[in-house]
């Protein structure tokens, strides 16, 4: 790709977004994906897979703080965490901030993602790959959760959209495997797209997850990079109290953890579970 050109996202056919490319840092097709990292004056370094923006330096903290601190603080005493995907290392970075976590396992299908992100997105991982609690497994996520003998308190599915390599992480086989290796009272979370534009993804996930978990819902966060703005995260557990904890309980856990965040706070945590009426209506109609 030539520099000083426009890069257009290809996720949607009728609308979309573009970024000015100031400098291409990396562009190569691996066995699994078409990977590119380029620099943009407004958003810093931008990573895209198969024509879809995955992360930018400017606003990645919103996505990663909400994907980690919401389930970890809701759980309250998570010791073993599994990350599916997350090769850029930012999810790992946020999990390592929880000192009570004893083991962090990350399953990434493509070793190339990890290697080039260590080089080209160092602010994302911030040295977290060297944390002694961390183990990297190069494997398919569905295979891992259905074969592993390990169990986890929190599972974070940092999956791409349900097309191509990411499609398997939205299947019943994957959700059943996650239930299989979750400890009692454990929490599963996953990105579920921008609900206003990709509502079918949320409805499909809710329908499938409900076969394996007694409490299934969603929470949301405003993330500018993802076209449409409001990202939806799937939530599944067998402890229905965890989705309804008071701000006082979350505040106490937040304080005890010694976290300092740029987006997440206890009030945001509680408010994130308030969903728009159109989503309530769509879920009720299923």
UniProtKB/Swiss-Prot annotation:
Q: Which GO terms describe its biological process?
A: spermidine biosynthetic process
Function of the molecule: Catalyzes the irreversible transfer of a propylamine group from the amino donor S-adenosylmethioninamine (decarboxy-AdoMet) to putrescine (1,4-diaminobutane) to yield spermidine.
Q: What is this protein called?
A: Polyamine aminopropyltransferase
Q: Which Pfam families match?
A: Spermine_synt_N, Spermine_synth
Q: Where in the cell is it found?
A: Cytoplasm
Q: Where does spermidine bind?
A: 64, 88, 158-161
From which domain of life does this come? Bacteria
Where do the PABS domain residues begin and end? 5-238
**What species was this sequence derived from?**
Salmonella schwarzengrund (strain CVM19633)
Please name the SUPFAM superfamilies in this protein's record: S-adenosyl-L-methionine-dependent methyltransferases
Q: Known NCBIfam families for this protein?
A: MFS_SpdSyn, PRK00811.1, speE
Q: Key word Cytoplasm present in the record?
A: yes
Chain positions recorded as S-methyl-5'-thioadenosine binding sites: 33, 108, 140-141, 165
Q: Does the keyword Cytoplasm apply?
A: yes
Which Enzyme Commission number(s) are on file for it?
A: 2.5.1.16
Please give the pathway this protein is involved in: Amine and polyamine biosynthesis; spermidine biosynthesis; spermidine from putrescine: step 1/1
User: By its UniProt entry, which CDD domains does this protein fall under?
Assistant: AdoMet_MTases
Checking InterPro entries in the record gives: PABS, PABS_CS, SAM-dependent_MTases_sf, Spermi_synthase, Spermidine_synt_N, Spermidine_synt_N_sf
Self-association or partners: how does it assemble? Answer: Homodimer or homotetramer.
Question: Where is the major localization of this protein?
Answer: cytoplasm
Its keywords, alphabetically, are: Cytoplasm, Polyamine biosynthesis, Spermidine biosynthesis, Transferase
């Amino acid at each position: 790709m030539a520099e000083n050109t426009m890069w257009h996202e290809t996720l949607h056919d009728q609308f979309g977004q573009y970024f000015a490319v100031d400098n291409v840092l990396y562009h190569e097709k691996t066995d699994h994906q078409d990977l590119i990292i380029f620099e943009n004056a407004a958003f810093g370094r931008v990573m895209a897979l198969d024509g879809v923006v995955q992360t930018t330096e400017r606003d990645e903290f919103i996505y990663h703080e909400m994907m980690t601190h919401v389930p970890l603080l809701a759980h309250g005493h998570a010791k073993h965490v599994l990350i599916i995907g997350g090769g850029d290392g930012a999810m790992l970075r946020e999990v390592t901030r929880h000192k009570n976590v004893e083991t962090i396992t990350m399953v990434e299908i493509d070793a190339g993602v990890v290697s080039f992100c260590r080089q080209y997105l160092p602010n994302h991982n911030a040295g977290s790959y060297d944390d002694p609690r961390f183990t990297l497994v190069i494997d398919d996520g569905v295979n891992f959760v259905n074969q592993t003998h390990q169990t986890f308190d929190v599972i974070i599915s940092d999956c791409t959209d349900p097309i191509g390599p990411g499609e398997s992480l939205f299947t019943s086989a994957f959700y059943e495997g996650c239930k299989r290796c979750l400890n009692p009272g454990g929490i599963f979370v996953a990105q579920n797209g921008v609900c206003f534009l990709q509502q079918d993804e949320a409805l499909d996930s809710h329908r499938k997850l409900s076969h394996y978990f007694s409490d299934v819902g969603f929470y949301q966060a405003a993330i500018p990079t993802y076209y449409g703005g409001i990202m939806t995260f799937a939530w599944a557990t067998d402890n229905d109290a965890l989705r309804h904890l008071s701000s006082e309980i979350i505040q106490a856990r937040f304080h005890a953890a010694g976290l300092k965040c740029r987006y997440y706070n206890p009030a945001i945590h509680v408010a994130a579970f308030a969903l728009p009426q159109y989503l309530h209506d769509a879920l009720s109609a299923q």
